[in-house]
């Protein structure tokens, strides 16, 4: 039969690239699970009353090249002015060796959070380096492996200050008046829900205020002033007030470490270390504190431990602080943070080393001195005598200066009364400084760079002598070796080789949606049109961004059944927090601020109760029945008991038990009956898109994990994006922003992230995914995800019982394998199976969530039948090994499972095990071998002997 031109054009070609099983493989799997078609399978599994009658209207699919061309045309509407706005964001020079070998490398960006340390030693080492950079520059004892951005780090610092404060009756948090405005915005938002009063005043007036438990200072101040806070911090410490300092990472290369001045907590943005501005993100925040406060710190902390052979190995330390264990009692709701960006900053420091970083910092400061000297020579007044890279210049004709700047395609900071702000950076050249002279003084200024340079080189007083760093930084060998591109390339490759990412094997983590992050989706994030915009540039310079964001928001509205989408939250946890704040403020607008009870099913993600606590709510747990579904009787009882105090319910759909609950609409109706709102966690949206939607089900608000359902890569633990979709009545209560008016959002609320659109530069990934898939492809992706999960469940059911199923014995897009019966019989645990899977070349499924003693498997739609069968065969082979243990062929204490994973060095070491080398490292015919570099980690040793900075190079060898 002759094909039509439309068929030959094949606009849906990407759908077949994204979805792993081809049509023949899909039919084989459908036959295996006993279904006629994808539609028939979906019809059996998804409750009839929530199935969409018509698909969401998000358009037809486009080819990769057509979508890239369309997005390039949109991006070209952005105007790339030279930015001197500052305020925590500067232009950078990302070394090409890091750009090509990390940011553009799926071996780095497709990995998951390092919960399985044996397959994560490379990025754990890079993160440990990041912590070492933080420790050296801040002068403190303990550092985390990144937070979401500087402003949210400030909010975390405030919360931490209250936790560790000895002034238990104090309830006021002091913020210095020269803190960045976006930071103050986020701090105020967080303080409101915690019931803290925020005081903003000149730092020197802090002692005039009573009942203060914590203080936030900025070094360098938002308008450029360097402060010597040594005496002030000493006085605050004598009064038991916890001191936090927001610090500029590049300035710290030259300035005295705040920790040395007595600060308790120091944080800031690592953006200046090689990460483009990207219209606001993503950027990693660094965070450090005194050792005595380590168990109150937020975020991941990488620690040095030992493996089963006694060798040095790295892991995430002190996880008992975190939301997935402590739930509403956690220090923070932060889970995934900004690992990929932290690793870029880490490797930027490795590549430049201390000498290179000092050269960059000194060059920035020298050019700032030259600019200052020239302006003062011509009669202009600087507001601050002490500065690093930012000048606050008083100008009589401010409008004229700004007009000349615009004509020269330059952005200055314009929100300072009777002055302009100018922040220089590592991209600034002497030619740029001459251009600034012309903008501020006119073309006939007569100034010469070399003459000014001679003057300031011998007589610079812009940094107080007491504020100059007098200690060495980055003395560890890792920062003093890899300075040629060859060495750097090989070092990065050596780290990458240690890890298991999607470029090597499927990562079947339940509730994580480790799907394809297509190359075509990733390409636009490094386009200068997207990468080089300042988040506070004039809106007319960001029309491309505005168009792309508006289009993406419109698609998400149609896919979710909501009325509006807010793009600001820069992680799923932030999305939860923002959604719950919208509910809280909605109730307050109706004079029902007393509604503060949040119902949460026992099966919920740990972030749910942690977020509810952060939003000022009380958590009440709703029971689940023996089938894993929400117990409607208990729900009604808890809702009735809460009565007029019921705020909301947080529910995940499909449930975390891997089934579509038949009564989800009834759950919504019960909560609405008692005046509550329904928060539907978007973690499992990959089983909804095109089939049903939160709004159609009856929910009021959801966050969407763009780093799951909509293809933003996990980056080894970030970046993420968690925009929220809301019904119309909640739209006025989504986050706003104090610096930038968000077009189309009639909101009066404070910000939850530093930038108005969160991590805007990764939004093109989701735009590309939706554009290339179209309505047809998006629905098919959800259906194949469901098919793949059911295929795995059906083939493994006899070996590993599936704990929960819905109608007709089906699961949704993931399934829970019950290991408990085997564990009781043989003592082989879910942990042993997880580690043994490494020997078979796989990352483990999710362990012991939501039920202890289980493995939760989510294959996603991107994995082919070949890969699914490889995983299934590995699991069946492991079951056969367990049977060998059960039969007494191998002893309980010495078998391939309890000794897993096995490493290369064991092949040449003395071998005393009752099984062969081949069984250990090439089980069941494994040919394409992934080699872990460490054996099983000793978690107890790591937490009892906490060490979170770089170890000698010899320890890695």
UniProtKB/Swiss-Prot annotation:
Q: Choose any GO biological process term that the UniProt entry carries and state it.
A: glycine decarboxylation via glycine cleavage system
Q: What keywords are assigned to this protein?
A: Oxidoreductase, Pyridoxal phosphate
Q: Which GO terms describe its molecular function?
A: glycine binding; glycine dehydrogenase (decarboxylating) activity; pyridoxal phosphate binding
Q: Which residues carry this modification: N6-(pyridoxal phosphate)lysine?
A: 708
Q: Look up the coiled coil feature and give its residue ranges.
A: none
Enzymatic reactions: N(6)-[(R)-lipoyl]-L-lysyl-[glycine-cleavage complex H protein] + glycine + H(+) = N(6)-[(R)-S(8)-aminomethyldihydrolipoyl]-L-lysyl-[glycine-cleavage complex H protein] + CO2
Q: Does the keyword Methyltransferase apply?
A: no
Q: Which residue pairs form cystines in this protein?
A: none
Q: Hey, what's the signal peptide range on this chain?
A: none
**Homology family:** Belongs to the GcvP family.
Outline what the protein does: The glycine cleavage system catalyzes the degradation of glycine. The P protein binds the alpha-amino group of glycine through its pyridoxal phosphate cofactor; CO(2) is released and the remaining methylamine moiety is then transferred to the lipoamide cofactor of the H protein.
Full protein name: Glycine dehydrogenase (decarboxylating)
Its source organism is Shigella boydii serotype 4 (strain Sb227)
């Amino acid at each position: 039969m002759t094909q039509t031109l439309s068929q030959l054009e094949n606009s849906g070609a990407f759908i077949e690239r994204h979805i792993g099983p081809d049509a023949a493989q899909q039919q084989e799997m459908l036959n295996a699970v006993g279904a006629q078609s994808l539609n028939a399978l979906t019809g059996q599994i998804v409750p009839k009353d929530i199935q969409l009658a018509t698909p969401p209207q998000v358009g037809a699919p486009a080819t990769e090249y057509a979508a890239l061309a369309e997005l390039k045309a949109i991006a070209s509407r952005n105007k790339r002015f030279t930015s001197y706005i500052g305020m925590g964001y500067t232009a950078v020079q990302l070394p090409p060796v890091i750009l090509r070998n990390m940011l553009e490398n799926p071996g780095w960006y497709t990995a998951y959070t390092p919960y399985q340390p044996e397959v994560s030693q490379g990025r754990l080492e890079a993160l440990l380096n990041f912590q070492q950079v933080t420790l050296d520059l801040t002068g403190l004892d303990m550092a985390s492996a990144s937070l979401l951005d500087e402003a949210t780090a400030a909010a975390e610092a405030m919360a931490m200050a209250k936790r560790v404060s000895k002034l238990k009756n104090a309830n006021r948090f002091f913020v210095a008046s020269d803190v960045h405005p976006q930071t103050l915005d986020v701090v105020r938002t967080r303080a409101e829900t915690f019931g803290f009063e925020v005081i903003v005043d000149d730092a020197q007036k802090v002692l005039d205020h009573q009942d203060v438990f914590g203080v936030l200072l900025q070094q360098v101040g938002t308008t450029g002033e360097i402060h010597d806070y040594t005496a002030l911090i000493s006085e605050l410490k004598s009064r038991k007030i916890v001191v936090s300092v927001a610090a500029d990472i590049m300035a710290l290369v030259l300035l005295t470490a705040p920790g040395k001045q007595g600060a308790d907590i120091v944080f800031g943005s690592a953006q200046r270390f090689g990460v483009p501005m990207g219209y606001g993100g993503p950027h990693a925040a660094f965070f450090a504190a005194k050792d005595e406060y380590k168990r109150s710190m937020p975020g991941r902390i990488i620690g040095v431990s030992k493996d089963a052979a006694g060798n040095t190995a790295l892991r995430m330390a002190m996880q008992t602080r975190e939301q997935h264990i402590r739930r509403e009692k956690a220090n923070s709701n932060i889970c995934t943070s900004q690992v990929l960006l932290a690793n870029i900053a880490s490797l930027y420091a490795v590549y430049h080393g201390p000498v290179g970083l000092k050269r960059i910092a000194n060059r920035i400061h020298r050019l700032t001195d030259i600019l200052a000297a020239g302006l003062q020579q011509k009669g202009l007044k600087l507001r601050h005598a002490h500065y690093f890279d930012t000048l606050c210049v008083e100008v009589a004709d401010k409008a004229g200066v700004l007009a000349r700047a615009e004509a020269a395609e330059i952005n200055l900071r314009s929100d300072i009364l009777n002055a302009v702000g100018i922040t220089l950076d590592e991209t600034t050249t002497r030619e740029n400084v001459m251009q600034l002279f012309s903008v501020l003084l006119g073309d006939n200024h007569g100034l010469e760079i070399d003459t000014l340079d001679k003057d300031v080189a011998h007589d610079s007083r812009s940094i107080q002598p007491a504020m100059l760093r007098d200690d060495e930084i980055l003395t560890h060998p890792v920062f003093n070796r890899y300075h040629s591109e060859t060495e750097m390339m090989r070092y990065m490759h050596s780290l990458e080789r240690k890890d298991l990412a999607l470029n090597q094997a499927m990562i079947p983590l339940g509730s994580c949606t480790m799907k394809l992050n297509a190359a075509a989706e990733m390409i636009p994030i490094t386009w200068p049109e997207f990468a080089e915009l300042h988040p506070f540039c004039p809106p007319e310079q960001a029309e491309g961004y505005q168009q792309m964001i508006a289009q993406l928001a419109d698609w998400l509205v149609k896919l979710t059944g909501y009325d509006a989408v807010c793009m600001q939250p820069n992680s799923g946890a932030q999305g939860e927090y923002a959604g719950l704040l919208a509910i809280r403020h909605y109730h307050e607008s109706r004079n029902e601020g007393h509604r503060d009870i949040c119902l949460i099913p026992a099966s919920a993600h740990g972030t749910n109760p942690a977020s509810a606590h952060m939003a000022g709510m009380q958590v009440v747990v709703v029971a689940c029945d023996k089938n894993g579904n929400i117990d409607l009787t208990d729900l009604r009882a808890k809702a009735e008991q809460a009565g007029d105090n019921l705020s909301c319910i947080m529910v995940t759909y499909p449930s975390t038990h891997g089934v579509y609950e038949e009564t989800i609409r009834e759950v919504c109706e019960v909560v609405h009956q008692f005046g509550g709102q329904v928060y539907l966690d978007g973690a499992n949206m990959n089983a909804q898109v095109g089939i049903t939607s939160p709004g159609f089900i009856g929910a009021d608000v959801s966050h969407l994990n763009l780093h799951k359902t909509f293809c933003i890569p996990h980056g080894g633990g970030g970046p993420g994006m968690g925009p929220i979709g809301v019904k119309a009545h909640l739209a006025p209560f989504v986050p706003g922003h104090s610096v930038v008016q968000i077009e189309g959002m009639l909101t009066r609320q404070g910000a939850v992230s530093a930038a108005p659109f969160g991590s805007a530069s990764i939004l093109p990934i989701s735009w590309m995914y939706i554009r290339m898939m179209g309505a047809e492809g998006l629905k098919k992706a959800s259906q194949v995800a469901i098919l793949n999960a059911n295929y795995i469940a059906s083939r493994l059911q006899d070996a590993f019982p599936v704990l929960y199923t819905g109608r007709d014995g089906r699961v949704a897009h993931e399934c829970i394998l019950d290991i408990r019966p085997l564990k009781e019989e043989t003592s082989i645990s879910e942990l042993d199976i997880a580690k043994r899977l490494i020997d078979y070349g796989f990352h483990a499924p999710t362990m012991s969530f939501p039920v202890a003693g289980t493995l939760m498997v989510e294959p996603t739609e991107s994995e082919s039948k070949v890969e699914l069968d490889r995983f299934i065969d590995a699991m069946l082979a492991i079951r056969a090994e367990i049977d060998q243990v059960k039969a007494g062929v191998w002893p309980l204490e010495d078998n391939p499972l309890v000794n897993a994973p096995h490493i290369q060095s064991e092949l040449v070491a003395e071998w005393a095990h009752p099984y062969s080398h081949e069984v250990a490292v090439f089980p069941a015919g494994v040919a394409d071998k992934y080699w872990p570099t460490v054996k099983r980690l000793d978690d107890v040793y790591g937490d009892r002997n906490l060490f979170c900075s770089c170890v000698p190079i010899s320890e890695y060898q």
